[in-house]
Amino acid sequence: MEPNSLQWVGSPCGLHGPYIFYKAFQFHLEGKPRILSLGDFFFVRCTPKDPICIAELQLLWEERTSRQLLSSSKLYFLPEDTPQGRNSDHGEDEVIAVSEKVIVKLEDLVKWVHSDFSKWRCGLQAGAVKTTALGRNGQKEALLKYRQSTLNSGLNFKDVLKEKADLGEDEEETNVIVLSYPQYCRYRSMLKRIQDKPPSILTDQFALALGGIAVVSKNPQILYCRDTFDHPTLIENESICDEFAPNLKGRPRKKKPCPQRRDSFSGVKDSNNNSDGKAVAKVKCEARSALSKPKNNHNNCKKVSNEEKPKVAIGEECRADEQAFLVALYKYMKERKTPIERIPYLGFKQINLWTMFQAAQKLGGYETITARRQWKHIYDELGGNPGSTSAATCTRRHYERLILPYERFIKGEEDKPLPPIKPRKQENSSQENENKTKVSGTKRIKHEIPKSKKEKENAPKPQESPEVSSEPEKEQETSNQKSITEPLPAAEGKRKMEGYQDFAARPVGSRADPEKDSDADRGAGGATAAEEAGEQGPVPPLPSAPAAPDRGPALGPGAGKQPLTSPSAPADSKQEPQPCCFAESPDSEPQEPPFPGFPAAQPPLASQSELEEDKLPAMADYIANCTVKVDQLGSDDIHNALKQTPKVLVVQSFDMFKDKDLTGPMNENHGLNYTPLLYSRGNPGIMSPLAKKKLLSQVSGAGLSGSYPYGSPPPLISKKKLIPRDELCSGLPQAHPGQGSDHAAVSRPSVIQHVQSFRSKASEERKGLGDLFKHDKLGRSEPHRCSFSKHHLGPLADSYALKPDAPEGKDKLLEKRALPHAHVPSFLADFYSSPHLHSLYRHAEHHLHAEQTSKYACRDAYRESENSSFPAHKHQEKLHVNYLASLHLQDKKPAPAEAPADEQPTDLSLPKNLHKPTGKVLGLAHAAPGPQESKGAPQFPAGNGQSRDGHPKACRVSPMTLSAPKKYPEPLSRASRPHHVRLESFRKLEGMVHPVLHRKAGPQAVGAARPIKRGLEDLDLVIAGKKARAVSPLDPPKEACGKDKGAELEGEGGKAAAAHGGPAADGHKAALSSPIFPGLYSGSLCGSGLGSRLPAGYSHSLQYLKNQTVLSPLMQPLAFHSLVMQRGIFTSPTNSQQLYRHLAAATPVGSSYGDLLHNSIYPLAAINPQAAFPASQLSSVHPSTKL
């Protein structure tokens, strides 16, 4: 080979220091010129004795100082030519690369090429692409372009290819190609796809992109490489001169990262961990620089490898130490309940725990580093970003969270408190702090974490309600949570329901036992008890409310509800059986004993309420779900509170609600059924600031009643108020204590049930009232009402219980119920918010009351028949309607005579209790009852039979039936008890609706405490009347009841008697069923002509809505109720708007309220239930828009 035969081909492709880089060179092989370019594969023999291998030319350069022509190549050997030899893991086309590149002078490289390689038989024989095929369609240019972009790293090889063409090398003489394993797999896959196609297909750009390789050489062989090995003798080859490896380093960089980079490569995470410390780091740095040369310089490689032997040993040592450290660290941190889950990043690099620990120990440990402020040094050791301004703090916090506990453990300082972790604003800092805190707290006190959580929960609770002790709160909260989280079977739910009924029936004291059952109830009960005390004593509702608010924060669900229901807290606590009525309540529902405790809470003490506060956090969601049921309680409580100091109490309740925001809202949802609607279903108890503002504004601006758009109306019977009512009505309840109590318990789900529960509690008081207002019909109606309530509530509760019990847990049940209840209260609240709606509701209530007075006997008969075997649905609706009417009548009745405190437990009674507005309404009702009754008398009398019939028909459609279907088992058991349950459920719903409306009416009607008082009495009477009426399913009984009621009404109160009169009672009797909610429900209310409303279909649908949806949020299926509550009902053009129109018209006119109701609402409703109110009007007036 002539010395001048070596020459560069093509233009230089790069300059760096003394080096000039080229793309190809030309030499003579066997007298023929040949060109080798970058990326070419060719066969070589390093020495005549060495096996054939494949060389890949990777770099060509000339050193200007020494004029040396050098090359860097990668060598590939067959597995059998390696020290390990071939094994089953090696592929037939596999080769193994030498780990280090070899730096060889071009003259030596040419010598390596001069050999006989004909014996090479390995590799995949690829089909060569004929040059003739490449000549067509520009495929050759495409192939060259592809090679230039991919195989030649984007370098321009046109001049090199031109030179090759000039030498006659159009057909590449490259007979071998080494691919990466992925490339090889793709290539084989492509060959399989095109196995029946000519090789020229591989020149297609798509085939090339998918892994095809177009080889133009005659006998191309395709191999792949996926592994490397250290060649034992290669470094001894004299031709290899690693000392000439190009030094391609740029300007010197910081040396600190060097060891770390080296560590990361070698697997040693911290050079400082080595005993040698910095010396090791230096060695590694040197090794790295030397090794970087070996990549291009084999001589260096030899030297470096020698140098590295000790380093490698050290590295292995370090690796073992590091592994042991990491194992011990992770194990310890896991044992102390602060496992290291994700290693954070510091300065864009993941922290090396071993490096960090070694660096810290070298500097003296955590205390020393902190005292000397050397955390930045640790950060630098970790190779963090030098520009970080929070490097020291971040590093220290990471260390505190991840390593400090272990360091203390090693040093025996485990008892030493970990540094407090401050909340951090920066993402990393905050994460680190939180992690540190968690870790620190955990390691400090393994048992402290659960404790901490409990304490945290308790702490907020105590703050919310200082009265409550943390531990009781925790315990109660825990119990509540458990109860809430444990769904009961449908059967169990039913049993619990029954238990609740029994509980409601039981004396208040005995019911107090259930406090254990439900702390939430207890909380409510505590508030109720306080309110009761307030009511019984001269305690103003405001103080009671404040007390409740104090608990409120903690009571969130219970106390919050109580504050809202504070006015009716006494009744509520007595009626806390409401939970029973609530199939959702823990007893009726497996949901949570704490909820059942709600009933228990009715009588519970403030301490209970405090306890509930403790558990409120746990019950927040549950309460939110239970809002519907609690609503009834809330309505009752609010009603009572309003009776004494309605506005203040309600406002306080809302304030408490505010304070409890999260827990309170949920509890208050009981009173504020709408809250669940406002809140997301997932978080029914949480109220948005805006919603809260609106709620408060409504509370204060709408006269408290309107301000309960979320459900404040539900607590129509405030516990305090209920207590007086109990006292007033104790005679009545005693007259039918067993029945009333049971019904109350069953009715508990609704406000009516609340009232009934209260009745059971205050049955003796009611007895006294009964003596005061001894009306056989009234007394009878009271029990009937209770029965109806019981029937209604029973089915409702059953449905509640069944619905949740069978398929869902208590939580879900509560949630669902809360939502429906929330919807109902929303609708009611909306009405209440609007003075017109308020008046309308009162008017309807008044009619119902009058009607119920006349239907007490009928209701009794109906209830009995219902108890016996009346179709639950039919009678329930009928009863429910009657019951509502009775409630309304009684609401008005009690104004003259408070004896019907019994009726207070019912929905309507609850509103009446709230009856500040009720007093007003009573006044209106009494003032305008003459005309109303006269109109109603003819209308209702004319439609009396109809109304009864219609009511029964409506009852047949009874929403309870729907409820029952909703609640799987309920429908089956609805026949007898379910009927009662359903009635109770309806009543519950009705109670909720009425209380809500009443609440709004009450606050809006507002009046003085005396009107409220009168409202209370009226409410009681109305409730009794309603119950009786609701119970009476038969037309004749209805008439009888109506007459009795009329008489009773007359006897009960001069106002009511004068207003309602016997005929009025009759008229109300018919009107009561429809008119109760006719005003509210465009369909029913509009049925001023009971005949129109009386038709089974019409009456039924209206009552269904009224009873099912209004009474029970569970009854959302009630088309009207759902619509009404969600403004959907009012959407019906005629119905909604007309309804609202009537409400608006009725509310403005105080004295002519009755007339308005009669003339506008009843006639319209009677004739065109749906056309009663235009949808637009309703929507515009509907308070929902406010929310």
UniProtKB/Swiss-Prot annotation:
Keywords: Activator, DNA-binding, Isopeptide bond, Methylation, Nucleus, Phosphoprotein, Transcription, Transcription regulation, Ubl conjugation. One of its GO terms (biological process) is adipose tissue development. SMART domains: ARID, BRIGHT. GO terms for cellular component: nucleus. Pfam families: ARID. The modification N6,N6-dimethyllysine is found at K337. SUPFAM superfamilies: ARID-like. The keyword Phosphoprotein applies. Residues 319-411 form the ARID domain. The modification Phosphoserine is found at S264, S1032, S1132. There is a cross-link at residues 130, 446, 494, 496, 767, 774, 803, 810, 893, 916, 920, 935, 988, 1000, 1013, 1055, 1069 (Glycyl lysine isopeptide (Lys-Gly) (interchain with G-Cter in SUMO2)). Its main location: nucleus. Methylation at Lys-337 prevents DNA-binding. Demethylation by PHF2 promotes recruitment of the PHF2-ARID5B complex to promoters. Residues 251-279, 413-611, 891-977, 1032-1065 are annotated as: Disordered. It is found in: Nucleus. Residues 460-469, 527-537, 1055-1065 have a biased composition (Low complexity). Residues 447-459, 512-522, 1036-1048 have a biased composition (Basic and acidic residues). One of its GO terms (molecular function) is transcription coactivator activity. The ARID domain mediates the interaction with DNA. Belongs to the ARID5B family. Transcription coactivator that binds to the 5'-AATA[CT]-3' core sequence and plays a key role in adipogenesis and liver development. Acts by forming a complex with phosphorylated PHF2, which mediates demethylation at Lys-337, leading to target the PHF2-ARID5B complex to target promoters, where PHF2 mediates demethylation of dimethylated 'Lys-9' of histone H3 (H3K9me2), followed by transcription activation of target genes. The PHF2-ARID5B complex acts as a coactivator of HNF4A in liver. This is AT-rich interactive domain-containing protein 5B. It comes from Canis lupus familiaris. The gene is ARID5B.
